[in-house]
């Protein structure tokens, strides 16, 4: 007889092979055709809101792995909250203005932005941005990210632009907007000013020079003739703009005699400077404090101009001479200290970094050329003491990667000082995750200079300011802003560039200064950080499904100086509080060796390749597996490991489904009080899983979710529970209480796992959902299912502790079995008999388990010996269980053809001579019951 047909073998159509690259697009199509996002929103209407506001990615190029990390994290959070009782809409957005799009339009279309019609150029930029919005939208959707993809927010939309200039107008009305000549970060390659957030630092090799500034008037402190103050600089090209030398008021300065000349520098730096100059013999002539030297006048060795000694707290003794070359047109600290002394602000450069006529003999030279020319001229004039090179961290444009400069130009600024204290107070009321984020942004805001918000480019929102054509008065008021808002809503911001100023001002506008009705308009546009920093007002405050402030902003940690900062500034300036309740940041991407991903290293991972080869769910699991608050590692090897973890989870779910093929939840479920003890333990473990995972989701600790579920599948289920109950599932009568008890656990477990995993493995859980037994009225998608709740009646601390001890015994037995396999050629554990030699306490603990011990250990027989009985030589004792010794022998009897147990009862039933007594009874019952 073929006894395999009498077994309850697992069966399911749920595929063993995931085949995600092919299957995921089908599921994506199902979500779109059935408007799952809309159905989720409808189902959650009226519930408490949870608003995650999407920081807009830049509409330029295809997605990289950083986008993937960010968007999947957001999707995990949204899906969890929507399943757990919240109305959690997700409105994606794009940042669509700015320099990179201009550069691509110029490059791809062969345009000259200075020659082409400005409106035509802006239209080309718009087309380019919208092209990549559409490309990125499809790429984000392919990741399984759920959202209102048909109605995203775009910073180029007319309504958005209208609200943005409204924010600008509100800030101007409060006195926070001003125009001033001030040094700003300037990219000579992009020909525009930059904000702090657009600057990144990298190593640069720069000239290092020590220069003598001859003293013209020592204020009677020492003989000026033959005396010089020594400065050090790494930017020789800025020396033509020098107007002062800054000393620290409290530092000691010495005048030293070196040969025929006298040099003045900080006392602490004399030794390193003279070593560099190769000077061994010198004599200290006089000592002064910085304060005493204030007002001493030197001559700029390059220009026919005085350079006065001033005092500044910014002077340090870390490098140089303690005497700081000061050019207010080329440095913020120089500018600020210069303002106190009413120093002129010189900046003899044009937009491209070329010296103007104001640069005298250096006119026409670019910065690199000027560096060489300045050094050569200093040497010729005998003012150069030392010339060399140093490597140091230097600011670069984060768009074009070229080194940038400080350059004084007329720019528009937002006065951070006007609302700095309010912003600092607002920061304290926000929850920052990780907590160090609070200190980081607090210090940035505390130390931040005023925000340069003007850009000398074309593709952006214009600065909505008019000038009187007669007297030059700047004009911005409620009337001009509201009128422009209406024009922008109707025509978009292109109207500013398409029309003359007279067609843009409200009817009847007069200059409040001179009464003129003739106007011109500002030509600069706004910093794109002002664009995205206005999204809280343009999106959160206007979309009916959203709310202001947001519950959460989630971006990379670089956004403390970027979007978090600009959003905070515009919100505090106009509304008096932060636009977010919580801010969560993730780290950057690195390879396995901790190196930043870059094209030059060739260590990048293209998410499109991973999706093509492994599927989006593998990417999603990778995101969940990482402690993203630190830098996140990615490599081909890591993706392989994640794929293996995915397989483990999938195969566990498949096993659960396969053993529920004949289970009808409506009639076959076994109540708790009738369950076997092992099944009650498994249900207890399941409730603890729900509690632990839910807490981890609440705390945004998705790596804890991943590890907890993975361990539950690998350990609690596969290595313990499922291993033990296989015999019961396969060999017991199909409808027996014991088998149905186990199936009840499997049914509860798969129902919990499919929900707990949905925020992460969105595609796979949708597939599993279709194979769950019973429940014809189940929601169409697992994303519409409720979050699993802890069934407290199954929580049992006593049972937890009891089985913790039983499983310790099981682990020791497993070690003894493994040793026996190696020493006795034991083979399968069912060939074994296990002899337990316990002490009195362990004996009392194990005795009530009786025949269950063999089932738990997955052996054919367990003999529990009396306390005090001596174990044979070679028995195993585990340090963690000193009251127990284990000895393994072969089990007596024959192997049952049906259950594979070795039993002395095999052959006792003559009708079934190859079966053990238990199996023979089951088979006869099956025959009797037809």
Curated annotation (Swiss-Prot):
InterPro entries: aa-tRNA-synth_I_CS (IPR001412), aa-tRNA-synth_Ia (IPR002300), Anticodon_Ile_BEm (IPR033708), Ile-tRNA-ligase (IPR002301), Ile-tRNA-ligase_type1 (IPR023585), Ile-tRNA_ligase (IPR050081), M/V/L/I-tRNA-synth_anticd-bd (IPR013155), Rossmann-like_a/b/a_fold (IPR014729). A motif ('HIGH' region) lies at residues 57-67. SUPFAM superfamilies: Anticodon-binding domain of a subclass of class I aminoacyl-tRNA synthetases, Nucleotidylyl transferase, ValRS/IleRS/LeuRS editing domain. GO terms for molecular function: aminoacyl-tRNA deacylase activity; ATP binding; isoleucine-tRNA ligase activity; tRNA binding; zinc ion binding. Its EC number is 6.1.1.5. The keyword Cytoplasm applies. Belongs to the class-I aminoacyl-tRNA synthetase family. IleS type 1 subfamily. Catalyzes the attachment of isoleucine to tRNA(Ile). As IleRS can inadvertently accommodate and process structurally similar amino acids such as valine, to avoid such errors it has two additional distinct tRNA(Ile)-dependent editing activities. One activity is designated as 'pretransfer' editing and involves the hydrolysis of activated Val-AMP. The other activity is designated 'posttransfer' editing and involves deacylation of mischarged Val-tRNA(Ile). IleRS has two distinct active sites: one for aminoacylation and one for editing. The misactivated valine is translocated from the active site to the editing site, which sterically excludes the correctly activated isoleucine. The single editing site contains two valyl binding pockets, one specific for each substrate (Val-AMP or Val-tRNA(Ile)). This is Isoleucine--tRNA ligase. It comes from Moorella thermoacetica (strain ATCC 39073 / JCM 9320). The gene is ileS.
